[in-house]
Curated annotation (Swiss-Prot):
It comes from Bacteroides fragilis (strain ATCC 25285 / DSM 2151 / CCUG 4856 / JCM 11019 / LMG 10263 / NCTC 9343 / Onslow / VPI 2553 / EN-2). Pfam families: Ribosomal_L27A. The lineage of its organism: Bacteria, Pseudomonadati, Bacteroidota, Bacteroidia, Bacteroidales. HAMAP family: Ribosomal_uL15. GO terms for biological process: translation. Disulfide bonds: none annotated. This is Large ribosomal subunit protein uL15. Part of the 50S ribosomal subunit. It comes from the Bacteria. The keyword Nucleotidyltransferase does not apply. Residues 21-31 have a biased composition (Gly residues).
Length: 148
C-alpha cells in the first residue's frame, strides 16, 4: 500500500447530482424544479416569514412591552469587589475613576453600589447610586457615602 494507490472505502462516496446538463444525464429538462411557475425560475425567493397565505406568526402573536426612553442604566458593583480593590491598592477613597482603571466599567457608564459581600475597610465610596444595604454596610464600617 502506497500513497499513490489509496482509495476511499467502497460505497463511502457518492457522485454529486449534476443537474441541467441535457436530457441524456437524466437530470436535464426541468432540472428537478418541476414545471413552470415562480419557483422554477432563477432568482426566486419567498418573503421571510411567508406561510403560504396563512396569517404569519409575527402577526398572530400580540405586541407587548416598550422601551422606556427615560431609563437610567447602572453598572452594578458589589461591596466585596470594593473591598478587594481597596485591599489591593491600599485606598481610603474609592471612586468612579478607580473602577475605570480596574476595568470594571467604561468611562461612559454609571455605577450603582450593591450590598453583596462584607466591607471591613473604612472607605469613602463615590458612586452614582447606592442600595440601602450598601449604604448601611459602608457606614457600619466607619466609611461614608458620596453620591455623584
Amino acid at each position: 500500500m502506497n500513497l499513490s494507490n489509496l482509495k476511499p472505502a467502497e460505497g463511502s462516496t457518492k457522485t454529486r447530482k449534476r443537474i441541467g446538463r441535457g436530457p441524456g444525464s437524466g437530470l436535464g429538462g426541468t432540472s428537478t424544479r418541476g414545471h413552470k411557475g415562480a419557483k422554477s425560475r432563477s432568482g426566486y425567493s419567498k418573503k421571510i416569514g411567508f406561510e403560504g397565505g396563512q396569517m404569519p406568526l409575527q402577526r398572530r402573536v400580540p405586541k407587548f412591552g416598550f422601551k422606556n426612553i427615560n431609563r437610567i442604566e447602572y453598572k452594578a458593583i458589589n461591596l466585596e469587589t470594593i473591598q478587594k480593590l481597596a485591599e489591593a491598592k491600599k485606598l481610603e477613597k474609592v471612586g468612579v475613576n478607580d473602577f475605570i482603571e480596574a476595568g470594571f466599567i467604561s468611562s461612559s457608564q454609571l455605577v450603582k453600589v450593591l450590598g453583596n459581600g462584607t466591607l471591613t475597610a473604612k472607605l469613602s465610596v463615590e458612586a452614582h447610586a447606592f442600595s440601602k444595604s450598601a449604604v448601611a454596610a459602608i457606614e457600619a464600617a466607619g466609611g461614608n457615602v458620596v453620591k455623584l
